[in-house]
């Protein structure tokens, strides 16, 4: 399938395993499965990368390892972005609809860059619920739809968690398998 349909995968916790010393490593199945750009930070090639597609820069980050190493790289990728729209995707969520599952470390590292470059949409997974925030800037909801970033957590598999109440979430769902359609038409990105 991956040889026939374009994919932009983000490595999750299940793509990693531990060796006999307890050190986590990316699965040996990852690289043969996908042919991905090699321009990510050293040591994260094919797990942190970006793709420009029809006016959209899609940036994939790796939330499993070397988080700090990706800060300067992400800053550079977004500073040199000629595309009209910017979408980030990664596995572990900054904001989650599942109770107690927000990721403060990711928020502290990456959110200032997301805000600085006015990223439009952040797609995340891991928490087996659905949640879509209002437009967010600096960790707070903004009132207009033309500024801030929308953060989405979604699930397509059968395992589900309970959703919680989160003040930034505009929509929440649990026990629901989903997929998303994103349409870009010039000056309009519809999610």
PLM features: residue spans?
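Short acidic, glycine-rich surface-loop motifs adjacent to enzyme active sites
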Residues: 81-98
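Catalytic-core regions built around general acid/base machinery
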Residues: 109-118
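Glycine-enriched alpha-helix->loop->beta-strand junction motifs that scaffold or abut catalytic
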Residues: 117-119, 148-149
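Active-site glycine-centered loops adjacent to acidic/histidine catalytic or metal-binding residues
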Residues: 12-13, 91, 125-126
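Functionally important transmembrane alpha-helices
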Residues: 121-123, 181
């Amino acid at each position: 399938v991956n040889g026939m349909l374009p994919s932009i995968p983000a490595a999750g916790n299940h793509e990693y395993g531990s060796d006999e010393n307890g050190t986590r490593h990316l699965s040996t199945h990852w690289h043969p499965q996908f042919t991905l750009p090699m321009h990510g930070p050293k040591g994260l090639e094919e797990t942190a990368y970006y793709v420009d597609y029809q006016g959209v820069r899609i940036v994939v980050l790796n939330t499993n390892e070397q988080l700090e190493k990706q800060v300067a790289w992400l800053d550079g990728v977004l500073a040199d972005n000629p595309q009209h729209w910017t979408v980030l995707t990664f596995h572990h969520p900054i904001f989650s609809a599942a109770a107690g599952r927000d990721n403060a470390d990711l928020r502290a590292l990456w959110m200032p860059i997301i805000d600085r470059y006015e990223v439009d949409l952040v797609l995340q997974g891991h928490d087996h619920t659905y949640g879509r925030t209002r437009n967010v800037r600096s960790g707070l909801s903004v009132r207009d739809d033309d500024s801030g970033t929308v953060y989405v957590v979604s699930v397509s598999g059968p395992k589900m968690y309970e959703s919680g109440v989160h003040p930034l979430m505009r929509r929440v769902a649990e026990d629901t398998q989903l997929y998303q359609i994103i349409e870009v038409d010039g000056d309009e990105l519809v999610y």
